[in-house]
């Protein structure tokens, strides 16, 4: 049988840094108010870079690190809710920029679960035997979707990209997975709704910026994500003691605290970087993974079991246990 494994990781964030004090100068908030509620102190904001620009930086790094030629890449999946345009896909722009002429490319839209969903799909593509190498990138410029007068959401989000290179392997590395969607709760977190207007009717005005029912999302993350992780471990016979690190979507420090208690895993196993990047949606997990590799916490030698878990708009949530 053929399986997939993560062979390279990379990340990139825009240069512009925006601190909580910077935000306090343009809206009614303070560093203390933001940090005590979220664990976020600063975030990176794109000035003149689009989502594809961030993703291209990651793709270039993955190629350089791997030593592969671009035409050896079979597919590129970009997980994003902030694409450059409705079409072409952000992934198509990445494919062109790195000259991966043999690759097919498409975007995955699953909000903050996007990277986990895309990684699960990529694993199946390689397991089919038809493809050998693929890139999965989470990239966002959420600053373009934020209402900068709404302190309930503007303080949360940042821009960035992270990704992995997957290659075929004789050994199984994606050990367990669970993916979920509940569209009945979709209105809890929305952005970029299309207007219903046409030449024949005038419908409701489009909602362009991020709007969130914070309490509903907080409760959902603690209840549904915790339950799905516990179920995943039980069904796969992987215990909490087998897990070396937990890399969850970087939405809010309080959410991580509560999930750690719910699943009874030591808080020290939960890596985090939201303090420096904020919520980067589909990019948060791969950025966190890339930094953990840079720091030597995760070794990419196939000896560690890592829990990856994303959750967000849709509502969507999903987890993978991977051997890295």
Curated annotation (Swiss-Prot):
Coiled coil spans: none
Taxonomy, superkingdom: Bacteria
Pfam families: ACP_syn_III, ACP_syn_III_C
Pathway, per record: Lipid metabolism; fatty acid biosynthesis
CDD domains listed in its UniProt record: KAS_III (cd00830)
GO biological process assignments: fatty acid biosynthetic process
Active site: 112, 249, 279
InterPro entries: ACP_syn_III_C (IPR013747), ACP_syn_III_N (IPR013751), FabH (IPR004655), Thiolase-like (IPR016039)
MF terms (GO), sorted A to Z: 3-oxoacyl-[acyl-carrier-protein] synthase activity; beta-ketoacyl-acyl-carrier-protein synthase III activity
Predominant cellular place of this UniProt entry's protein: cytoplasm
Region (ACP-binding): 250-254
GO cellular component, as recorded: cytoplasm
Class of enzymatic activity (EC top level): transferase
Catalysed reaction, written as an equation: malonyl-[ACP] + acetyl-CoA + H(+) = 3-oxobutanoyl-[ACP] + CO2 + CoA
EC number, as in UniProt: 2.3.1.180
Keyword Transferase: yes
Assembly, per entry: Homodimer.
Domain notes: The last Arg residue of the ACP-binding site is essential for the weak association between ACP/AcpP and FabH.
Protein name: Beta-ketoacyl-[acyl-carrier-protein] synthase III
The organism's taxonomic lineage, starting at the top: Bacteria, Bacillati, Bacillota, Bacilli, Lactobacillales
